[in-house]
């Protein structure tokens, strides 16, 4: 039973889902820790659950295209250094790019804009972030899927 052939497309999809689930668990742990630490140190006033829950989840959904880009790079190259280096080097200027009018062209700034609601002074484009993120996620994931199932096993 365990040695039956497995479809390459299913492997690609399941590995991506597992990667997204691990990142989601990290986000959930962050949300939970913020609430617990707030209670432990005795912060006064009502807990802003909407802000504590919505902002990190918005950033998570806007980061899905980044996860897809790094995933496609990691299955395309045998060396781990390339996707890791690209991911790290691309994340560093994200806050600087998010403060410009060119943020829309830089996927690493999407989580920042989504978490802020797209409410930097000049840029009020919160919903645009999710639309572009969705299209970019579908495009990158589809490209990676097609190249993965056609690739030689060597």
Features from the language model and the residues they span:
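Functionally important transmembrane alpha-helices
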Residues: 65-96
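Membrane-interface helix-boundary motifs at transmembrane edges
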Residues: 9-10, 72-78, 149-153
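Amphipathic repeat-derived elements
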Residues: 1-3, 70, 141
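Helix-loop-helix units of permease transmembrane domains in multi-pass membrane transporters
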Residues: 1-19
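Secretory targeting signals
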Residues: 13-77, 117-131
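Terminal transmembrane helical anchor/hairpin motif
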Residues: 84, 88-154
């Amino acid at each position: 039973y365990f040695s039956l052939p497995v479809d390459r497309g299913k492997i690609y999809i399941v590995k991506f889902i597992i990667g997204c689930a691990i990142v989601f668990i990290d986000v959930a742990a962050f949300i939970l820790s913020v609430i617990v630490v707030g209670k432990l140190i005795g912060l006064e006033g009502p807990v802003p659950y909407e802000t504590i829950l919505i902002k990190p989840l918005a950033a998570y959904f806007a980061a899905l295209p980044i996860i897809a880009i790094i995933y496609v790079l990691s299955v395309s190259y045998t060396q781990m250094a390339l996707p890791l280096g690209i991911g790290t080097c691309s994340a560093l200027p994200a806050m600087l790019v998010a403060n410009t009018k060119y943020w829309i062209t830089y996927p690493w700034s999407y989580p920042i804009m989504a978490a802020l609601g797209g409410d930097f002074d000049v840029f009020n484009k919160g919903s645009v972030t999710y639309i572009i993120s969705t299209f970019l996620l579908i495009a990158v994931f589809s490209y990676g899927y097609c190249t993965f199932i056609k690739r030689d096993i060597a």
